[in-house]
Curated annotation (Swiss-Prot):
The lineage of its organism: Eukaryota, Metazoa, Ecdysozoa, Arthropoda, Hexapoda. This is Cytochrome c oxidase subunit 2. One of its GO terms (cellular component) is mitochondrial inner membrane. The gene is mt:CoII. It is a multi-pass membrane protein. GO terms for biological process: ATP synthesis coupled electron transport. It comes from Drosophila subobscura (Fruit fly). Belongs to the cytochrome c oxidase subunit 2 family.
Length: 229
């Protein structure tokens, strides 16, 4: 989860988020190099004493400043396109989770099992335990197995919502009447926090998401307890 004064991205918990971080660093490095070069040229332009009143054009330099930006854009665009295709690819899922956005809470259904569905509300500050996180903890967490391909189907019952978990690199819009899907792979256990990322009304800030990633055997036990209860 994001912490105080954190200027970087959250620690990744999925291969897709790792790739997003790599691309961010790759693009940022190119932007820093361009900024330094342009800044250096501007400083030299203002402070040097060389003047040429007869310099009307320079074909070589014009070719360079036309071709070089095109090459730089290719170095940014190719990894970006590769990542876009990776994010949209749906592998064979082990589990399908359905998420429905409401004003202002989430409801979940485990489509592979019978009668496992629940609503997830934010815990109010006055009911929060000492180790809870304000505006982030919920009464019913999503429990998912680690090291498994998980497909999520997202929709909404009223207005547009957006189901987002930054540590997993997942952001899916929930639109009434439409079913959007994506998949992710959690590679470590832990609690991963997210929030609705589409302004959806007065209490938009109060519909958090919490995923509890557990080993497969713990997940099977949790499913068994839910089915038998």
């Amino acid at each position: 989860m994001s912490t105080w004064a954190n200027l970087g991205l959250q620690d990744s918990a999925s291969p897709l988020m790792e790739q997003l971080i790599f691309f961010h660093d790759h693009a940022l490095l190119i932007l820093v190099m361009i900024t330094v070069l342009v800044g250096y040229l501007m400083v030299m332009l203002f402070f040097n004493s060389y003047v040429n009143r007869f310099l009307l054009h320079g074909q070589l330099i014009e070719m360079i400043w036309t071709i070089l930006p095109a090459i730089i854009l290719l170095f940014i665009a190719m990894p970006s396109l590769r990542l876009l295709y990776l994010l949209d690819e749906i592998n064979e899922p082990s589990i399908t989770l359905k998420s429905i956005g409401h004003q202002w809470y989430w409801s979940y259904e485990y489509s592979d099992f019978n009668d496992i569905e629940f609503d997830s509300y934010m815990i109010p500050t006055n009911e929060l335990s000492n180790d809870g996180f304000r505006l982030l903890d919920v009464d019913n967490r999503i429990v998912l197995p680690m090291n498994s391909q998980i497909r999520i189907l997202v929709t909404a019952a009223d207005v547009i919502h957006s189901w987002t978990i930054p540590a997993l690199g997942v952001k899916v819009d929930g639109t009434p009447g439409r079913l959007n899907q994506t998949n992710f792979f959690i590679n470590r256990p832990g609690l991963f926090y997210g929030q609705c990322s589409e302004i959806c009304g007065a209490n938009h800030s109060f519909m958090p998401i919490v995923i509890e990633s557990v080993p497969v055997n713990y997940f099977i036990k949790w499913i068994s307890d839910k089915v038998n209860s």
